[in-house]
Amino acid sequence: MTASIRPVTPLQAAHLRGTPAILDLEASGFGRQSYPIEVGYVLPDGSSYCSLIRPAPHWTHWDPAAEKVHHIQRDMLDRHGNDIGDIARLLNERLRGLTVFSDGWAHDYPWLQALYEEAGLVPSFKLDSLRSLLTEREERDWEATRELVSRDMKGQRHRASADARMLQSTLVRLRGGASPAYT
């Protein structure tokens, strides 16, 4: 029996060096009836992706309070959202084999599962809690550092990829590194 060794891609190498891939989701609200309306990520190399999600016909829950936070209107999703299956396939292609981190894992995980269930696919990557990366000191200093990074990124909209970049930059700054560019 011959064992095959798969080469590590440049993206996987950057991931292994410590800058994590971060994923964020915006949703129609909170609770069992809510669903993802936007997904965004930033990779260890700084590249990012963001897409509005066209809701499935049976995804009807809409919370005006959530809209006030993310400023995404329901009709924007119908006009500009991408197909659920296309988004799931793209995420699988680009994130394959990575562990991707989220600051709101308890919410983001069910929303990501709803996306994949609707697409009839299984994620090719693992979603984990950003907290699992933090030392006690980093946890203690997280909020103050996030506020500094947020101020530096002034003018960034509250959207999935911008939030993911802010989270990644916060972690990098906590660890004494230069934050990636905010573009």
What is each model feature region?
Residues 58-77, 128-168:
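Active-site-proximal helix-loop-helix substrate-binding element of RNase H-like nuclease domains
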Residues 35-38, 114-118:
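Short, glycine/charged-enriched secondary-structure capping and boundary segments
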Residues 52-53, 126-128, 181-183:
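Short alpha-helical "patches" and their helix-cap loops
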Residues 99-106, 110-116, 145-183:
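Acidic, Mg2+-coordinating catalytic module of metal-dependent nucleases/exonucleases
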Residues 122-123, 140, 178:
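Substrate-binding/catalytic groove segments of enzymes
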Residues 3-107, 149-154:
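Conserved non-catalytic scaffold segment of RNase H-like nuclease domains
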Residues 116-127:
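A short alpha->loop->secondary-structure connector
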